[in-house]
């Protein structure tokens, strides 16, 4: 489990396709590389991935993304040099400063607008939503929580297939929101509490 409080960004060094496999091995460098361990869970742009190898000589580590993950997230869009938001899994005695994040991306959204207002940046996103998705809780709620590229954020405006969030300068600096521009895709994980409530309502109908 994660909290959506990004620790830092990792830099993609290379994307390798193992022979005969549809998986992709992603090698990244990050300041706390020497604190990582094989089999450890780390969220990358909100996607929970397992550390499969560590490379002390280049201060890097490798994770593997399967085809399902590549299709459902924006990890397949990554190129060497790109920055990725990273967060290690929560400790049992840690604080939940964001909201409950599973690291299971639901879908992607497209950034369709940026506006600087009073020192903060407002980002508008659009995503495809069907009646079935909405009934399963795959939606946003004004003043509710949503996880975007692994960042726990509060929705400031919500419509059926669009929503808006506000990013303060600090968050923009320590995450890859500073690299985000119109037309780029981001990963979305909707609030798990909302999804459970939607499921409960469906059962009762």
Pin down the residues of each PLM region:
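Conserved loop->alpha-helix
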Residues: 1-205
